[in-house]
């Protein structure tokens, strides 16, 4: 086994001085910052000079007390603030012996003229009280400043909350650290939000660019289609024009021949009629026979078949005009519709069994009722909830993501819809909605529901038109029309959502 001897080397001297300084610190009174004189221990274990602790416990200005002076009990330890009783002060003989040994080494004082005491450790060289000259070892929470043990006994701080300086620093650091952690968390949230915002903005810009291309392509295709149909119709009209012209030319040529023949025959008849009687009778029969070749009916200038063709084209032109007018109106109306409204659910209207998401966009049915205030707008029996905003004019639409299992319904309800007690889900009650029940989609009409012949739905658009009085439902995937309620709205209406099964949900999209 290796023996442990004194340290040698370049750092040995520094280590020895540090050890000596630490030993001096342990033998130094924390009140007077000098070697202990008559060291005594209080109940918490800390030691002080007898005179220092008694002076500290006396009221400032009362003079230097003696051991026989009667002091109130208990009193705080000047170092840790634990309660201590003056009657329980015990001489610390071991500490006195250590101090005696240190004095024999005759270590140099910390500064000239300081009663020959050794240098105090670094922790003892802290700031001192400007009023009493004592080390600032305590912290007054009421005044927010460091004080000495004498200040602590003064009238000014007697009723204040005072902590050891180290403890106050530790508490302040812990509080600052907790605030720093909270600030870092907020900063992380903001950075995450910024990252999400940037990503979503890029995605939206990308989506808008794609939509611009799609719109351009759709209108380009529409223009090409209209040009093609225009060409076909104009070509048909051109063909008919040529046919009419050709028929007209043929008829005119025929008429010209017949007119020439008739004029010639008319001249011959007139010439025969002017001849002498004998010559007239000889040529009469020949001239009369020529008259038998004259057409008995007038020629038609344009055939009925040609007229039918022209009439059909005119009819197409008339229909085209009506279709284009309706198309322009529908297209303009669709493009000028109100933007999709941003909805959130109103928790004050939600049935206690309904569980709303934190963003107030989704609703599902819980196993038991929650303890919620009995708000006058709350549905207490029907498991329904309204949106937070209602509408009294204009055109609006929103989209709803639907669960694949039975037990949901949604649509609109008038503001005065009954909230208390069990009420039917019908237009007579001011509810216009669709639902999924027994695996089948229904429009909730009255007296019987209307079955909707559609495939699986994952998202449905609700279009509310208060100008014409209509509530329409569309399958978002292909914008297929599902059903339209015709309503004479007399008051404000609110989007309505209902979930009556724990296996499904509804969510306002997105």
Curated annotation (Swiss-Prot):
Zn finger (RING-type) start-end: 29-81
Consequence of gene disruption: Deletion mutant protects mice from DNA virus infection.
Listed name of the protein: E3 ubiquitin-protein ligase TRIM7
Coiled coil: 165-275
Organism of derivation: Mus musculus (Mouse)
UniProt: Zn(2+) binding residues: 129, 132, 151, 157
Chain positions of all zinc fingers (B box-type): 124-165
Phosphoserine: residues bearing it: 106
Superkingdom of origin organism: Eukaryota
Annotated tissue distribution: Highly expressed in antigen-presenting cells.
Alphabetized UniProt keyword annotations: Antiviral defense, Coiled coil, Cytoplasm, Golgi apparatus, Metal-binding, Nucleus, Phosphoprotein, Transferase, Ubl conjugation, Ubl conjugation pathway, Zinc, Zinc-finger
InterPro entries, sorted: B30.2/SPRY, B30.2/SPRY_sf, Butyrophylin_SPRY, ConA-like_dom_sf, PRY, SPRY_dom, TRIM/RBCC, Znf_B-box
Reactions mediated catalytically: S-ubiquitinyl-[E2 ubiquitin-conjugating enzyme]-L-cysteine + [acceptor protein]-L-lysine = [E2 ubiquitin-conjugating enzyme]-L-cysteine + N(6)-ubiquitinyl-[acceptor protein]-L-lysine
Pathway: Protein modification; protein ubiquitination
Intracellular or extracellular location(s): Nucleus; Cytoplasm; Golgi apparatus
GO CC field: cytoplasm; Golgi apparatus; nucleus
Family (UniProt): Belongs to the TRIM/RBCC family.
Lineage of the organism: Eukaryota, Metazoa, Chordata, Craniata, Vertebrata
Principal subcellular localisation of the protein: nucleus
SUPFAM superfamilies: B-box zinc-binding domain (SSF57845), Concanavalin A-like lectins/glucanases (SSF49899), RING/U-box (SSF57850)
EC number(s) per entry: 2.3.2.27
CDD domains attached to this UniProt entry: Bbox2_TRIM7-like, RING-HC_TRIM7-like_C-IV, SPRY_PRY_TRIM7
Entry's free-text remark on domains: The B30.2 domain mediates interaction with GYG. The coiled-coil region mediates homodimerization and heterodimerization.
Molecular-function GO terms, alphabetical: transferase activity; zinc ion binding
């Amino acid at each position: 086994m290796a023996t442990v001897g004194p340290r040698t080397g370049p750092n040995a001297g520094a280590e020895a001085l540090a050890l000596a300084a630490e030993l001096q610190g342990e033998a130094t009174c924390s009140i007077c910052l000098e070697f202990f004189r008559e060291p005594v221990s209080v109940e918490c274990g800390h030691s002080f000079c007898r005179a220092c602790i008694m002076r500290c416990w006396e009221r400032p200005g009362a003079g230097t007390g003696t051991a026989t002076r009667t002091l109130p009990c208990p009193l705080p330890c000047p170092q840790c603030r634990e309660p201590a009783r003056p009657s329980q002060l015990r001489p610390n003989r071991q500490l006195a012996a250590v101090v005696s040994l240190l004095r024999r080494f005759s270590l140099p004082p910390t500064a000239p003229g300081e009663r020959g005491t050794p240098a105090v450790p670094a922790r003892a060289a802290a700031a001192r009280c400007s009023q009493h000259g004592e080390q600032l070892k305590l912290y007054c929470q009421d005044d927010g400043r460091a004080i000495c043990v004498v200040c602590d006994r003064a009238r000014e701080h007697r009723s204040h909350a005072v902590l050891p300086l180290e403890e106050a620093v530790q508490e302040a650091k812990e509080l600052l650290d907790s605030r720093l952690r909270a600030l870092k968390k907020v900063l992380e949230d903001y950075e995450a939000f910024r990252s999400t915002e940037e990503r979503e903005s890029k995605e939206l810009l990308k989506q808008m660019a794609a939509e611009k291309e799609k719109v351009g392509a759709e209108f380009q295709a529409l223009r090409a289609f209209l040009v093609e149909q225009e060409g076909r119709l104009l070509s048909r009209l051109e063909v008919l024009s040529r046919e009419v012209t050709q028929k007209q030319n043929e008829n005119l040529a025929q008429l010209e021949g017949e007119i020439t023949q008739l004029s010639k025959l008319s001249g011959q008849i007139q010439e025969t009629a002017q001849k002498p009687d004998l010559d007239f009778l000889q040529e009469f029969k020949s001239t009369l026979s020529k008259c038998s070749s004259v057409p008995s009916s007038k020629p038609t200038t344009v055939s009925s078949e040609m007229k039918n063709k022209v009439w059909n084209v005119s009819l197409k032109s008339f229909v085209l005009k009506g279709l284009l007018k309706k198309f322009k109106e529908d297209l303009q109306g669709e493009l000028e519709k109100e933007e999709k409204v941003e909805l959130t659910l109103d928790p004050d209207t939600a049935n206690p069994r309904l569980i709303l998401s934190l963003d107030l966009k989704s609703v599902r049915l819980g196993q038991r009722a929650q303890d919620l205030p009995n708000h006058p707008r709350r549905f207490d029996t029907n498991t329904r909830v309204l949106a937070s905003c209602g509408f009294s004019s204009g055109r609006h639409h929103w989209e709803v993501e639907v669960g694949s299992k039975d037990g949901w319904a949604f649509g609109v309800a008038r503001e005065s819809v009954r909230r208390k007690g069990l009420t039917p889900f019908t237009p007579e009650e001011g509810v216009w909605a669709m639902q999924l029940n027994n695996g089948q989609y229904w429009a909730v009409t009255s007296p019987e529901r209307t079955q909707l012949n559609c495939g699986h739905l994952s998202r449905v658009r609700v279009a509310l038109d208060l100008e014409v009085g209509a509530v329409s439902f569309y399958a978002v995937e292909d914008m297929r029309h599902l059903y339209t309620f015709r309503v004479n709205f007399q008051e404000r209406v609110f989007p309505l959502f209902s979930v009556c099964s724990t296996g499904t949900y509804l969510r306002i999209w997105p």
